Each structure stands twice: as C-alpha cells, then as structure tokens.
A protein has these predicted regions:
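A short, glycine/Asx- and small/polar-enriched loop/turn
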Residues: 37-41
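Secondary-structure boundary elements
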Residues: 17-25, 49-56
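Extended, charged low-complexity segments
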Residues: 151-207
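Acidic, metal/cofactor-coordinating or nucleic-acid-engaging core segments within structured domains
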Residues: 74-154
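Conserved catalytic cores of phosphodiester-cleaving nucleases, focusing on short active-site segments
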Residues: 16, 44-46, 59-65
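A short acidic/basic microdomain associated with nuclease active sites
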Residues: 20-36
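Active-site ExK catalytic segment of metal-dependent nucleases
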Residues: 55-83
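A short, highly charged nucleic-acid-interacting micro-segment common to nuclease
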Residues: 1-13, 34
Length: 207
C-alpha cells in the first residue's frame, strides 16, 4: 500500500483553512524534507483565538485514509489521544511540536506573531489561556457510490448523508472509550471516497 500521509495532510489543511477558517501554524511537510529536523509529530497544527472562551486554541491535526472507516476512526483517535493527553514535560511529542512551533513561527504580521508567542511562553500569564484541541480527517471507502451508472447524484448524496448520521454516534462512543480524549474539543471531517486506492494512485501521479 502506498503511503498517502501527504495526501491526508494536504486535504486536512485545505478543509481546516477553508471551512473552519483556521490558519496552519505548523506544517509537517516542510519539516519532513528538512534534513536538519527529525519530525514525527502531528499532521499539522492550527490555531485560533476563541472569543467565547477568551483562549488561544491550538488544534493538533491527524489524518487517516483507509478503506475501512472503523479502523480509520480508531487509529486517528488513538494517535490524537497520544498527543493531547501525553503527560510529562520537556520530551513529550507535544512539547517537541511546541518547540518546533515556537522556532518556526513565521507570520507576515509581526504584532500577531508577538501576541501568539505570549500564549506559548510558560512564564507569561497568557500561557494560562492556551487550550489544546484536536482536528481529524477520516477518509474511507463509501459503499453508496455505485460501480456503474445505476444511481443518480441526488440518490447517492442522500445515502451518504444518512450513513454519516449513523457514524456520528460511533464517533462519540470512540471518544468516550478513549477518555480523557472526550474532554477535549475535537473536530472531525468524514470524507467518503469511491475508492481510496484510486485516490492514492491519482495523488501520487500528481506529485
């Protein structure tokens, strides 16, 4: 099976920035191609200031694109739990991501950059207003897609929506099964594919 990590990371980035309107503050792909940086962290980190809670929220991103949605959900949440609930200081993967984040922070607006750095400084009072969250992309084979032209587009759309509604309860239960992950804010994108292997091949042909 070809590695589609980059495809998932790119799709996650597009969805988070276009739909959730959150900028990506740490991108995994440039770090992986930098020989001076050994990176095995999240599939990107995104940030926004939440006016409701008055906190700066960092979203750790995870993407999994499998043929089976159950395995994709489980692996995605397992990875996310390791990042968000990992305890200890200094040498955890979350802390290593934070160090890379601080070192590679690069915004066009120097005032925005300075403000964000205040939230990342443990010695600054703003650090108490930093909140960790999660965002996931789960891609899977959707059986509602026909293998021929026997269904019209509206029919396929309705079937997929109904199945996604069924998946919602499964998502909630999987988060509860991975407590304390269920205590965190976690955004989930479900992306149905006609065939994930075809998607892999097409993506690989473009890079």
């Amino acid at each position: 099976m070809k590695n589609t990590g980059e495809a998932g990371e790119l799709a996650l980035s597009v969805l988070v920035q276009s739909i959730l309107r959150m900028p990506q503050v740490l991108c995994k792909m440039p770090l992986k191609t930098n020989p001076e940086v050994h990176y095995h962290g999240a599939d990107g980190v995104y940030g926004k200031y939440d006016t409701a809670t008055e906190k700066y929220c960092l979203y750790w991103g995870e993407s999994k694109i499998y043929s089976d949605i159950s395995k994709a959900l489980s692996d995605c949440f397992d990875s996310l739990k390791e990042f968000l609930t990992e305890e200890g200081l200094g040498n955890t993967r979350k802390e290593r991501d934070m160090s890379l984040f601080r070192a590679n922070l690069d915004f066009d607006d120097p005032y925005l950059e300075a403000a964000i750095l205040e939230f990342l400084d443990p010695e600054n009072l703003q650090y108490l207003k930093l909140e960790y969250r999660g965002v996931c992309l789960v891609g899977y084979n959707e059986e509602a897609y026909p293998k021929d032209l026997s269904k019209i587009e509206d029919e396929i759309y309705t079937e997929i929506l109904n199945r996604v509604s069924d998946f919602k309860s499964k998502i909630g239960q999987r988060l509860i099964n991975r407590t304390p992950l269920d205590k965190f804010v976690v955004e989930v994108f479900l992306v149905p594919f006609a065939n994930v292997d075809d998607f892999r091949d097409q993506f690989q042909s473009l890079i």
